[in-house]
Amino acid sequence: MSHEAEEDLLEYSDNEQEVQVDNKATEVNAEGNGESQAKDSDKKGSYVGIHSTGFKDFLLKPELSRAIIDCGFEHPSEVQQHTIPQSIHGTDVLCQAKSGLGKTAVFVLSTLQQLDPVQGEVSVVVLCNARELAYQIRNEYLRFSKYMPDVKTAVFYGGTEYKNDIDLLSKKETVPHIIVATPGRLKALVRDKHIDLSHVKNFVIDECDKVLEELDMRRDVQDIFRATPRDKQVMMFSATLSQEIRPICRRFLQNPLEIFVDDEAKLTLHGLQQYYIKLNEKEKNRKLAQLLDDLEFNQVIIFVKSTVRANELTKLLNASNFPAITVHGHMKQEERIARYKAFKEFEKRICVSTDVFGRGIDIERINLAINYDMPNEADQYLHRVGRAGRFGTKGLAISMISSEDDEQVLAKIQERFDVKITEFPEEGVDPSTYLNT
């Protein structure tokens, strides 16, 4: 990192409590003596092993408990089990957990639990790197606050009419209590004094590594951060959190609880079958059609490396009687959201996308991810294939390898995540290995 970048960081305390959550760590903490646990429980960022049997053990507001039941959730995931008991009490959090384990629900439930809505005051700010992700997070807030009619939530991101945001924020009765936004748009609203963040109590960054690794976006975040009170809860979440980015995250945190679910080398998803297919570039279309014909799937997402390839492949699929839609960063925002919504609502089973859908997007029916083009780096592979097999369910990921560069990326993926990705068998794979019964 450059010296200039280091100087641009906020100077906050680096004092933190780190928790490595795996089976062994959980057992050790759960068996600690009562005296030490009682002592630690008063310390912000401390950790006591908790084995909750259900969401009811978190003693959430009745309105939240009803919404959770409506969603069909009974038992918290590992990351929820270890994080929610402290996050609902205002502890700062730095959390890394693999894709699909319910990180979003951690901060949505925690902030709603703490929220005491006051008309005209913004209490919660959630930042993320992608517009579709912001839209999705807003919908999660709507889902879990369905029995909290006084709570108002809004989403702000670039590519939409700035005046509409200003109009919403100009009237006390329409000012949202919860804001989900991309940094650029919210920075503009803060800069132009259209929004007052002086009452913010919870500040969340989802996909924090992606948000903070780019210097321009980090500076936007810092400007927004400075507009909020110093005394607030800060929570950060991501599926990948490199050793290099962690100190940058900690600059925003005060004595945080750090949760790392599983060793970083084991971040690939349980229940996700992963294969590769070696072939020439010109063979990809024929092989893709064969896979779509032969495999059983609910919905599939196909990743390509460019907007042009996304558009061309979608045309080809539709012409070949495979109804598909495409989503990429070069289309108008309204169109992107409309297509995302159509895919999520199962209007189409096939989506061709660039990496704009490679992070955080949660569509429950996706159980097949295909890398038509390989990503450039190992971490992006994890985020891509994590679209299948969400929340511990089964799924299938297939990567097409057509160059030496692809082979090098595949080798890095296997080394980085300590996983063996095998060649796709000629006879195919048993659907029971990747379909939930």
UniProtKB/Swiss-Prot annotation:
Provide one Gene Ontology cellular component. Answer: spliceosomal complex
Q: Which residues cross the membrane?
A: none
Motif DECD box, residue numbers: 206-209
Phylogenetic classification of the source organism? Eukaryota, Fungi, Dikarya, Ascomycota, Saccharomycotina
List where the motif Q motif lies: 53-81
Region feature Disordered, mapped onto this chain: 1-45
Q: Which SUPFAM superfamilies match?
A: P-loop containing nucleoside triphosphate hydrolases
All copies of the Helicase C-terminal domain together span 287-432
Which family is annotated? Answer: Belongs to the DEAD box helicase family. DECD subfamily.
Q: Which domain of life is it from?
A: Eukaryota
What are the residue boundaries of the Helicase ATP-binding domain, all occurrences included?
A: 84-259
Q: What class of enzyme is it?
A: hydrolase
Q: Which gene encodes it?
A: SUB2
PANTHER family with a match to the protein in the record: ATP-DEPENDENT RNA HELICASE DBP3
Q: Which compartments is it annotated to reside in?
A: Nucleus
- Keywords for this entry? ATP-binding, Helicase, Hydrolase, mRNA processing, mRNA splicing, mRNA transport, Nucleotide-binding, Nucleus, RNA-binding, Spliceosome, Transport
Q: What is this protein called?
A: ATP-dependent RNA helicase SUB2
The EC number of this protein is 3.6.4.13
User: What's a single GO MF annotation on this record?
Assistant: RNA helicase activity
